[in-house]
Amino acid sequence: MASNWRASASWYSHPVYARYWQHYHHAMLWMQGHQNAYRKFRDSYFTSPWLFPHGALPWNSPAYEAGHPWDSQGQHMAQQESPYRVSHPKSPGQPLRNSSRTQASTRGNEARCEEEELESDSDDEVECDLSNMEITEELRQYFAQTERHREERRRQQQLDAERLNDYVNADHGLYFNHRRSLEPPSEKPWERRQAEMKRLYGNSAPKILAMETAVQLSFDKHCDRKQPKYWPVIPLKF
């Protein structure tokens, strides 16, 4: 397996691709530096004493997430309360009106929740008796037509998905592969094209391939310079 991996990885380790890999590593270093800078800014923002005094942290900060575990359903396991609430120390002579008001509002919320649960339970218990429902011929035709429409729409969606997968943009060739993968390429660039040219033109394949490459390079150069807009391939009907 190791020998096969070296054989497949040898062609893109060629020095001719060194400049590409150099740009690739520079881009990866820039992305990692950007992520580190964003992480540091996020940590400093959420731990700033001027923005969040008295230890009040937003629910999506790292310190808040570390101090509050989550269960398997993604719900909070601690007491459900606002993460922005700040707990100030009470003075000895301070009245307890705020706490009594909070307890009263909590009881009111619990009572409303219980009423909503009872209403939802009573709604779930309502059942429709369809045993005496009259099924006419018009209703049967309606159901049959609805089922036909659903089947036609399902087939049309499948055809649209297949057509979209096979669609090739105007700025790409017929052999353009738009599927992305993290795996290294299994064959060398132009290997399939060279084999096809060899099969078609025999010993004259290198000469014809060089001419085609020159024409393609000239076309790409003028396209990069002029930036033309591709005309849609639409048949004209007179």
Swiss-Prot record:
GO terms for cellular component: cytoplasm; cytosol; Gemini of Cajal bodies; nucleus; SMN complex; SMN-Sm protein complex. It comes from the Eukaryota. It comes from Mus musculus (Mouse). The modification Phosphoserine is found at residue 122. Keywords: Coiled coil, Cytoplasm, mRNA processing, mRNA splicing, Nucleus, Phosphoprotein. It holds the Pfam family GEMIN8. Residues 66-127 are annotated as: Disordered. This is Gem-associated protein 8. The SMN complex catalyzes the assembly of small nuclear ribonucleoproteins (snRNPs), the building blocks of the spliceosome, and thereby plays an important role in the splicing of cellular pre-mRNAs. Most spliceosomal snRNPs contain a common set of Sm proteins SNRPB, SNRPD1, SNRPD2, SNRPD3, SNRPE, SNRPF and SNRPG that assemble in a heptameric protein ring on the Sm site of the small nuclear RNA to form the core snRNP (Sm core). The keyword Phosphoprotein applies. Residues 131-164 form a coiled coil. GO terms for biological process: spliceosomal snRNP assembly. Widely expressed in embryonic tissues (at protein level). Its main location: nucleus. The keyword Transport does not apply. It is found in: Nucleus, Gem; Cytoplasm. Part of the core SMN complex that contains SMN1, GEMIN2/SIP1, DDX20/GEMIN3, GEMIN4, GEMIN5, GEMIN6, GEMIN7, GEMIN8 and STRAP/UNRIP. Part of the SMN-Sm complex that contains SMN1, GEMIN2/SIP1, DDX20/GEMIN3, GEMIN4, GEMIN5, GEMIN6, GEMIN7, GEMIN8, STRAP/UNRIP and the Sm proteins SNRPB, SNRPD1, SNRPD2, SNRPD3, SNRPE, SNRPF and SNRPG. Interacts with GEMIN6; the interaction is direct. Interacts with GEMIN7; the interaction is direct. Interacts with SMN1; the interaction is direct. Interacts with GEMIN4; the interaction is direct. Residues 72-82, 96-108 have a biased composition (Polar residues). The gene is Gemin8. Residues 113-127 have a biased composition (Acidic residues).
